[in-house]
Swiss-Prot record:
Phosphothreonine: residues carrying this PTM: T174
Native organism: Debaryomyces hansenii (strain ATCC 36239 / CBS 767 / BCRC 21394 / JCM 1990 / NBRC 0083 / IGC 2968)
GO MF annotations in UniProt: ATP binding; calmodulin binding; chromatin binding; MAP kinase activity; protein serine kinase activity; RNA polymerase II CTD heptapeptide repeat kinase activity
Protein name per UniProt: Mitogen-activated protein kinase HOG1
Activity regulation behaviour: Activated by tyrosine and threonine phosphorylation.
The protein's required cofactors: Mg(2+)
TXY, short sequence motif: residues: 174-176
GO biological process: cellular hyperosmotic response; cellular response to oxidative stress; filamentous growth; negative regulation of cytoplasmic translational initiation in response to stress; negative regulation of exit from mitosis; negative regulation of G2/M transition of mitotic cell cycle; negative regulation of induction of conjugation with cellular fusion; osmosensory signaling pathway
The protein's Enzyme Commission number: 2.7.11.24
InterPro entries per UniProt: Kinase-like_dom_sf (IPR011009), MAP_kinase (IPR050117), MAP_kinase_CS (IPR003527), MAPK_Sty1/Hog1 (IPR038783), Prot_kinase_dom (IPR000719), Protein_kinase_ATP_BS (IPR017441), Ser/Thr_kinase_AS (IPR008271)
Phosphotyrosine: residues bearing it: Y176
């Protein structure tokens, strides 16, 4: 461990963690595609926190944009069932660190450790839907809901995390993004048109996994994934097939043998440990046609949610998220300036003041003549794909 003024440098899993002296007792808790997460103690508050290092955020414009998007979303979305950003800073090595509250575990770990009792299944489903109602009201789609992105503490308080892949509500959404098991069929079928309903499909997959203790659609690849979906739901209806934009995908779907759907009451007949209302809600989430899929708002009013549903305590986001930056095709240096500006703004909002390193870096790049973009971003016909 090396101390350098306000920062302490240590190696964890071969990764350099360079954090402010405010945080001590680092211990690794998880590794993702875009960063390493450690638990730590916040000396200022005495609380346990999670510190997420974003790996090489300025190595490419795509990664810089992804990090900027996640930061903007974490600043904007403030809800009891969403992870809360408590601090953010840049290290002397120009790595970015997000500090959030520390949850004891995630749903994936919980599901692999023991079966869930029905009251926990119900309460966790309610909290996911409560958080999603807020997210969708802000004009945001999560796009990557899965058990490992559902954090839970010892009091069974649940928080949705990892908004790095979140996107604007847009009828021309593109690309594969979510983990395959939880991916809505319209993403696989069209690669083009989808909306908030993709998140409800993911919730249905998560609810089923909580009920049975194993993934509902464990596809080995995209073809197998779609095939096992049709084993339960039957062949997609004609109006869904008509929305398929790819000729290759259309030919593949049309080549499949016709399958009749299996009633959910029959498929989950052995799941006597949960209420029939849970299976009914599941059937309303896992529908081929996204237009017929239940919304988060309506799902909260479903009889299965009745023990927890309280319309006066299920808030929406008062201000839509500003996606004006999202189609911008900007160089890394510009994203860097924008990122520094957002970090300074965050510290001004929370009243803590930005750390000196950030202010010095901001002054330095301004001296180098790199200017932040105007409100009119350079537009591109299509956003670069983020994997």
């Amino acid at each position: 461990m090396v101390s350098d003024g306000e920062f302490t440098r240590t190696q964890i899993f071969g990764t350099v963690f360079e954090i402010t002296n405010r945080y001590t007792d680092l211990n690794p808790v998880g590794m993702g595609a875009f960063g390493l997460v450690c638990s730590a103690i916040d000396k200022l508050t005495g609380q346990n926190v999670a510190v997420k290092k974003i790996m090489k955020p300025f190595s490419t414009s795509v990664l810089a944009k992804r990090t900027y998007r996640e930061l903007k979303l974490l600043k904007h979305l403030r809800h009891e069932n969403l992870i809360t950003l408590d601090d953010i800073f840049l290290s002397p090595l120009e790595d970015i660190y997000f500090v959030t509250e520390l949850q004891g575990t995630d749903l994936h770990r919980l599901l692999t450790s023991r079966p869930l009792e029905k009251q926990f299944i119900q309460y966790f489903t309610y909290q996911i839907l409560r958080g999603l109602k807020y997210v969708h009201s802000a004009g945001v789609i999560h796009r990557d809901l899965k058990p490992s992105n559902i954090l839970i503490n010892e009091n069974c308080d649940l928080k949705i995390c990892d908004f790095g892949l979140a996107r604007i509500q847009d009828p021309q959404m593109t690309g594969y993004v979510s983990t395959r098991y939880y991916r809505a069929p319209e993403i696989m079928l069209t690669w083009q048109k989808y909306d908030t309903e993709v998140d409800l499909w993911s919730v249905g997959c998560i609810l089923s996994e909580m009920i049975e203790g194993k993934p509902l659609f464990p596809g080995k690849d995209h073809v197998h994934q779609f095939s096992i979906i049709t084993e339960l739901l039957g062949s997609p209806p004609p109006d869904v097939i008509e929305t398929i934009c790819s000729e290759n995908t259309l030919r593949f779907v049309q080549s499949l043998p016709h399958r009749d759907p299996i009633p959910f009451s029959e498929r989950f007949a052995q799941c006597s440990h949960v209420e029939p209302e849970a299976i009914d809600l599941l059937a309303k989430m896992l529908i081929f046609d996204p237009k017929k899929r239940i919304s988060a708002l309506d799902a909260l009013s479903h009889p299965y949610m009745e023990p927890y549903h309280d319309p006066t305590d299920e808030p929406v986001c008062e201000v839509k998220f500003d996606w004006s930056f999202n189609d911008a095709d900007l160089p890394v240096d510009t994203w860097r300036v924008m990122m520094y500006s957002e970090i300074l703004d965050f510290h001004q909002i929370i009243g803590a003041g930005a750390n000196g390193t950030t202010q010095e870096q901001m002054a330095q790049i301004q001296q180098e003549g790199i200017q932040a973009p105007s409100s009119q971003y350079q537009q591109t016909n299509q956003e670069q794909k983020v994997e």
